[in-house]
């Protein structure tokens, strides 16, 4: 992962941790693998104990603000802790890849 992307992940993560209780955050995808092109987005998974549509919108707003400052689009996917650890998404290739290859923030 490029240093600038790691700094962006840390900046995003700090804002999320200031806003939500005990979130888990991982970057994944092409920017983590080093295969990104300049137009690639930064994929980030956020796991919260619980969330509603307002919380999801707030995560997106934080992503937009952090990414805008860096000129990078941050794409987020949000799961509840139960979904991520035990629900149907936990068996998906996406969640498995995030767990194996993602960079925790």
Segments predicted by a language model, with ranges:
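Catalytic core of pol beta-like nucleotidyltransferases
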Residues: 1-24, 32-34, 38, 48-105
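Short beta-strand->loop micro-motif that forms the acidic, two-metal-ion catalytic signature
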Residues: 42-46
């Amino acid at each position: 992962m490029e240093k600038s992307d790691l700094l962006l992940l840390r900046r995003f993560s700090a804002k999320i941790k200031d806003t939500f209780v005990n979130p888990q955050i991982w970057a994944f995808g092409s920017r983590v693998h080093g295969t990104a092109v300049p137009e690639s987005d930064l994929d980030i998974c956020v796991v919260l104990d619980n969330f509603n549509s307002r919380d999801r919108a707030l995560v997106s707003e934080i992503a937009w603000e952090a990414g805008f400052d860096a000129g990078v689009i941050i794409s987020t996917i949000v799961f509840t802790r139960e979904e991520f650890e035990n629900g149907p998404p936990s068996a998906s290739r996406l969640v498995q890849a995030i767990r194996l290859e993602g960079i925790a923030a």
